[in-house]
Amino acid sequence: MQTPATIKSYQDIKANIEKACQRIAPLWPLKHFVAVNPYVGLRDQPFWRADQTLRKITGKGLTMPRPYYEEQIANGRITQEDLDEALKEMHSNWSVTQLKQAMKQRSASRNVPFPVFADAMFADDRRDWPGFVVERISQYCAAYFDEGQATWSMPWRDDPMYQAWLKFMHFDKSPRMVGLRGIGEAAAALPAAAETAIALALKELSVPFDLIDDYLFAALLSIGGWAGWARYLRWQAELKGETDQSLRDLLAIRVCWDAILHKTCADIAVRKQWHLMLHTQQNRAIEKPSEHVDAILQTALEIGYQRSLIKSLKEASRPSNTVIERPVAQAAFCIDVRSEIIRRALETVAPGIQTLGFAGFFGVLMEYVPFGSNAPKGHLPVIFNPPYRVCEDLSHASEDETQRHAAKRQLRLRVATAWKSFKTSAVSTFTFVEATGLLYAPKLFGDSMGWTRTVPHPDERGLDSGTKQRLRPRLIASGNGKSSAKSTGIPETERAGVGEFILKNMGLTQTFARLILLAGHGSTTVNNPQGTGLDCGACAGQTGEASARIAVTLLNDPATRRGLEEKGLKIPKDTYFIAGLHDTTTDEVTIFDTEDLPTTHAKDLAQLRQWLADAGELTRLERATLLGTASQAPEVVTRDMRRRTRDWAEVRPEWALAGNAAFIAAPRQRTRGVDLEGRAFLHDYDWHKDAGFSTLELIMTAPMVVANWINMQYYGSMVDNLRFGSGNKVLHNVVGGSIGVLEGNGGDLRVGFALQSLHDGKRWIHEPVRLNVVIEAPQAEMESIISRHILVRELVDNGWLYLFQIDDDGSVYRRVCDKQWPRMT
């Protein structure tokens, strides 16, 4: 290989490296598997330009296969009117007739991914060299990043990733086993610095300068799962003001593999094939969006949904300016689309109740430390840093008793870990099964029949039922209360400020009911590595229980209420907040800490429980349509949904956020009584009460962005499951402890959602449409926020979501280019 002295424009290469790294979306670990926009690194490009970029790099863009759209036209989901509007939207000169004619013609040239050198080797002998390279890198990454799953850990994990790989390659004999010679020697000749190695690799491969960006992006996407994990490590470091070079090092490893294969390849034909591939890329033309048939059809699909949504909103009741009487109760749920159904059901069984929608962390920006643990869990949107750390504590216990119970849990967890290590160790493989196998027969039978849970719920491991019932968040601060290793709780002087933030942004500043429920949400499943993806995204992939309980504790705190009153927020003395958890698998709501309620509210609580039970039944019956039990009696539907929480063979315990398509920030009266089919994120917001529009700014910079991430995660998992989804859930194997899953026993780390989360085996349940954001607020204020926040501006201006304004009179306007807001008819 050439020496560093021959490298020119090193700073330019460094910029190329950074650009490629920024294109990769982070992949959160299984312990808090939050949805993320897989195209987040392309948001600086207009949506259909990003489609062109992806078709050039991966061979697959942002649309479904043609037959999908043909089916939507055939069943009436896409109408003639939708097609006509889509042609105008895409500035196409075609008529609908010409479009339909073009649909019959398949593209003459298939979209070919941007090549890596292993592709040239594959083209020569048809052996899966790209898969071999990915397999070797994936095995290395699994060992390097392992979080305790491996019995024997890699000896070089303390070294930077690239330097550790150089040592690993000295011992890796797998290339020789498949007929590759000189690999170890070529790896040993690589420079020690990752950036220098990348520059040398590009020289070795003769990648033209104008293709460097594309090549580096393609190289990272070829190992995109582990690239996502490395990007996550970098994301976490950046939140702390630090840096992490794992992604850069992974890029170096990937391009160095290509350079090594090129250097050791003696076949002139393969090298010629490689240069021909690069030349083809330099002269490649991609269809314009206006001539891209599937882009027009995708736009028509989205227009069809918008037409239905806007019609529903226009027909809904308009918000009233009259003073609302005191509700019989108030219930705040997360904005999650699954809450839309149960809110609508609760309002049906109890017309006098008021429901609200707010992000499920309920405004408490914290990390939460489970009882007996030293490892905090984030309970806030992942785009924020937690200012507070709150510990789970044993109620009504002395310090000595608390320490005894904590030590007992830690001991149980250590014993369980040791026992599992013994059961899975090489020495006990046969003796353990022969000696104790029959003792597991009753549990195996019960688990197989779905009568028992295969394992305890993660939050209950090491706890007996009595201790579990006594656990609750500890509000009292130690230290300064800020998020650090030694300080916990929320200082009394800051509680009123936190309380004001909660109530103001929830839109709950007057007309308080006697009983106010804050209901977080979570899912209950077994044998589901990606189970936290069903929990609350606003709580960083945890259930909303802790967030709801700490918010309730704070708002019931006398000191907090005194401080709130000084700020002009007077909560009536007979108003009490209570925490709950909506199980989205069964639609049952558990209420916590009821012993703290005064006896004067016993009837209120009993009535609320009954309403929640009735609403849960209505919700289950509605969801049964998509679960195949719609024809069954209510009690049968309930039993089936409870079974899903225990059945280790159930690949579709619930549909989670499949179908999500809209985000609505408006007074509830705007959507009350409207069947939004569980497809809309609902955030209560009344701009008339938002002095300074700080709440509007929060909505557009946090919940709206998170909803876009969720929406695009589903979108990417559906339109390109191979790269941005996780394949077949049945084949998932956990790697690295809790890092992620492989499909089968090898290949790249998988990202996104499994096919079973999108398809019921016969038809697609999710519909890939970009998020439709509808906000009831002045256009000028929204424009001001868009101009101040580049992230929001990129999402709106580049078409990664649709933004609509709904006026006081119910008129709807769509934000288009040049800051124009044409009225929707």
Swiss-Prot record:
It comes from the Bacteria. Zn(2+) binds at C334, D336, H521, C536. Its main location: membrane. GO terms for cellular component: plasma membrane. Signal peptide: none annotated. Forms a complex with DabB. Pfam families: DabA (PF10070). Belongs to the inorganic carbon transporter (TC 9.A.2) DabA family. HAMAP family: DabA. This is Probable inorganic carbon transporter subunit DabA. It is found in: Cell inner membrane. Keywords: Cell inner membrane, Cell membrane, Membrane, Metal-binding, Transport, Zinc. The lineage of its organism: Bacteria, Pseudomonadati, Pseudomonadota, Acidithiobacillia, Acidithiobacillales. Coiled coil: none annotated. Its cofactor is Zn(2+). InterPro entries: DabA. One of its GO terms (molecular function) is zinc ion binding. It is a peripheral membrane protein. The keyword Cell wall biogenesis/degradation does not apply. Part of an energy-coupled inorganic carbon pump.
